């Protein structure tokens, strides 16, 4: 039930060509989750690929600060994205859902830091 509410406000994407998701130093308007495919991350003059099954823009979303990296979805990436303002509203109205969703984001962050 609760997860359906989050998916209801999500937009599905299926990229046909590289698509910018976040730009370092700017506050992202969307949070992304890559289900299949990859994204190219550029940070501190380094580039690397992440995905599938990763969030993009989660740190900026959690701490309400600009993105720490520029990220492009590669062609053929599939997933969902949420407008951050809509997601924030939904989670503010559903505290238990917010705890669970923030837990997913934190788990994703921890796994990235461990690599």
Report the location of each language-model feature.
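Cyclic-nucleotide recognition modules
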Residues: 47-106, 110
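Regulatory nucleotide-sensing modules
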Residues: 1-44, 50-59
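A cross-family signal for key residues in well-ordered alpha-helices
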Residues: 4-7, 107, 111
């Amino acid at each position: 039930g609760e997860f359906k509410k989050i998916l209801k406000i999500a937009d599905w994407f299926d990229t046909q060509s590289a698509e910018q998701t976040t730009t370092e130093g700017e506050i992202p308007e969307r949070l992304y989750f890559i289900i299949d495919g990859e994204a190219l991350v550029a940070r501190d003059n380094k580039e690397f690929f992440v995905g599938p099954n990763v969030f993009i823009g989660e740190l900026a979303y959690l701490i309400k600060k600009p993105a720490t990296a520029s990220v492009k979805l590669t062609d053929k990436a599939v997933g969902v994205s949420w407008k951050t303002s809509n997601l924030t509203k939904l989670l503010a109205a559903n505290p238990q859902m917010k705890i669970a969703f923030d837990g997913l984001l934190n788990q994703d962050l921890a796994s990235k830091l461990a690599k």
